[in-house]
Amino acid sequence: MKLIIIEGGDRVGKDTLVKNLQEYFVDKDVSLMIKHWGFPQGKTNEEKTAYQKEQFRNEFVRFNTLRDVKEMVVIWNRSHIGEMVYGPLYRGSDPKSWVISLEEEFRFDKDPEIYLIYLKADPEFLAVNDDGRSFSNKIVDKQQELRFFREAYESSKIMKKLMIKVNKQNEYIESTRILDEVIQFVTQS
């Protein structure tokens, strides 16, 4: 089984990449499962953090039960990696230790069929293209978010990681080019 984790801030093309991967794999002889992580539930920051911890653990357990299914591709749109960004930024939590512990406990650090794809863009580009649903459209906030994503990406114990910049100046790079790069990475590495 392959697990492809798509991460990055808002407006970097995660949903587009997931849709394109789905279309790519539909013609292959594999089962496909897609999980999209949403906002944490809870009234307080502590409840939201506890919710995230429980949900990620449950999904890791579920993933582990499917691990031996050879002809399966699982795609996570957002993941535990994002918790190392948004937990500190918006809930005042410090999830790095438990997030990395999950990766180690469930052998994400030893599995060559787990792929982390980090989509990034310039902070100015993200601020200009913000759709109003992000936490902030200020460049300084985007810079901090990108810095946290970079740190989370580098801290992750996942063996196979790919970072893709999705913009060139003021334009998105063609989604087919990004898809081709990801397909090459997950099928030939």
Where are the model-predicted features located?
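NTP-dependent small-molecule kinase module
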Residues: 132-189
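Conserved substrate/cofactor phosphate-moiety recognition/catalytic segment
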Residues: 12, 16-72
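Hydrophobic anchor at the beta1->P-loop junction of P-loop NTPases
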Residues: 6
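Surface-exposed cleft-lining segments at the edges of enzyme active sites
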Residues: 36-51, 83-95, 135-137
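Conserved P-loop NTPase "ATPase switch" module shared by AAA+ and STAND
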Residues: 71-84
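P-loop (Walker A) phosphate-binding loop of NTP-binding proteins
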Residues: 9
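Loop/turn-to-beta-strand initiation segments
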Residues: 69-74, 113-115
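A glycine- and Lys/Arg-enriched "phosphate-lid" helix/loop adjacent to the NTP-binding pocket
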Residues: 86, 90-154
